[in-house]
Regions:
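Bacterial N-terminal signal peptides
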Residues: 8-20
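Boundary at the C-terminal end of the N-terminal hydrophobic targeting segment
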Residues: 20-27
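Extracytoplasmic small-molecule ligand-binding "clamshell" domains
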Residues: 27-100, 170-174, 261-265
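Periplasmic-binding protein-like
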Residues: 38-41, 110-122, 146-151, 165-167, 204-266, ...
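Bilobed "Venus flytrap"/periplasmic-binding protein-like clamshell domains
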Residues: 39-43, 47-62, 115, 119-175, ...
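Acidic, polar ligand-binding/catalytic clefts
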Residues: 58, 62, 67-133, 143-144, ...
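Alpha-to-beta junction loops
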Residues: 66-67, 85-94, 135-137, 179-180, ...
Length: 280
């Protein structure tokens, strides 16, 4: 047997062994669920993975046999165009159903804006039509449905204090989402009109005695206060959408537990309400 024949045979054996050892690694390779995350926006997400969306992303990824990989970007205008649509990430959490720039999943919870005040103030305000509101100092997130509704009712002026809903910690860090709730707890405002998950989280965090009234939709006046919340993927990515919806259905109870643990005020999904109305 020649030296060349021996070497050739040895190379064949080594190649076969390398290929055989490589196959299991490929089979066991964990794929990534690439999430568009806000780096500093509790209660929703942060880089320490402490938010609602961080926890839900972990649950969904685990169900799909994947690991979570984040692209951090403040959730402001331009997120879809600059980050999701350029392929830097594949899924956004916590978007309203019907948000047109993306392909959205079936919703995984429903919540809304709340009217909140301290229980020890002796107030009994149940709606935006209560005449007491014209005499109280109201904190409200600007350019939101409750803000518009106050204007429709002529509640404007010095007794209305505006707060930011959208937040970028790189600019105006003092306008963090919980500031309105913390000002309410401190007595800086009498009543707060605030997005429910923000109100519930910061009230629970501070162990504050707050009364929170979920605002009812008023279709006749164009006031919509409750929203179904979905995940969003790039338009056309029906495969990922389907996988996410399947995982959301399987993990419904676990996701609900996460939301309740964060103090999110929950409403029946729109589909459930429609079924209840048509039930015999």
């Amino acid at each position: 047997m020649t030296r060349q024949t021996i070497l050739a045979g040895w190379l064949v054996v080594v190649s076969a062994l390398l290929c055989a050892s490589a196959r299991p690694a490929q089979a066991d390779e964990v794929k990534e669920l690439r999430v568009c995350g806000d780096p500093n926006n509790l209660p929703f997400s942060n880089e320490k993975l402490e938010g609602i969306e961080n926890k839900i992303a972990d649950v969904i990824a685990k169900d799909l046999g994947m690991s979570v990989a984040y692209t951090w970007w403040p959730h402001q205008r331009g997120l879809v165009k600059r980050v999701l649509n350029t392929g830097r990430c594949d899924v956004m959490l916590g978007i309203p159903k019907g948000y047109d720039p993306v392909l959205w999943t079936k919703p995984y919870y429903r919540t809304g804006y709340v009217l909140a005040y301290r229980k020890d103030r002796g107030l009994k305000v149940r709606s935006l039509d209560d005449p007491q509101l014209k005499k109280l100092k109201i904190g409200v997130q600007v350019n939101t449905p409750p803000h518009d509704a106050l204007g429709q009712r002529g509640i404007v002026g010095d007794n209305v204090v505006g707060y930011q809903l959208m937040f970028d910690s790189n600019f105006h860090a003092e306008d963090y989402p919980g500031k309105l709730v913390e000002d309410l707890i401190a007595g800086e405002v009498d009543v707060a009109l605030v997005w429910g998950p923000i109100a519930g989280y910061f009230a629970k965090k501070k162990a504050a005695p707050l009364e929170m009234v979920l605002l009812e939709d008023r279709p006749e006046s164009g006031n919509r206060f409750a929203f179904d919340i979905s995940m969003g993927v790039r338009k056309g990515n029906k495969e990922l959408k389907g996988k996410l919806e399947d995982a959301l259905a399987r993990k419904h109870d676990e996701i609900k537990h996460i939301l309740e643990d964060f103090g999110v005020p929950l409403l029946p999904a729109a589909e459930e309400k429609a079924r209840d109305k048509t039930a015999p």
